[in-house]
Amino acid sequence: MVEQTDKGVISWHPNPQTPAYVPPAGAVDAHCHVFGPAKQFPFAPERKYTPGDAGKDMLFALRDHLGFARNVIVQATCHGRDNRALVDALRASAGRARGVASIAPDITDAELQELHDAGVRGIRFNFVKRLVDATPK
């Protein structure tokens, strides 16, 4: 459950219910995000929304609570092309997560290798303009 606060920050449900359905062994949460913590991993100035902090520890606790074995962590648009929160989560996952990064067209081979070494296996293309572009086209 997500709730919009009066300050424009999206707040997360503090106590999600355990689902009645049990995922099969080895099940993967195939699309999830880490958000911040903003003091360590600031949100992009051009972001279209501001989430409450929901870092790697919260994500991994939710994964375990829901009964998933692994995650595919997708770079959140609120972090723009700064993949540090994603990479931090991947490195802390003990091999239980892979990532999808957002990159600039001029990314270097060395930067791509660093993302790969952290566990990134895909690139996110943002075609939904409402997530990344203030002006509808």
Region annotations inferred by a language model:
Residues 2-81:
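An N-terminally biased module of ancient metal coordination in phosphate/nucleic-acid-related enzymes
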Residues 2-11, 80-137:
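Active-site gating/metal-coordination segments in enzymes
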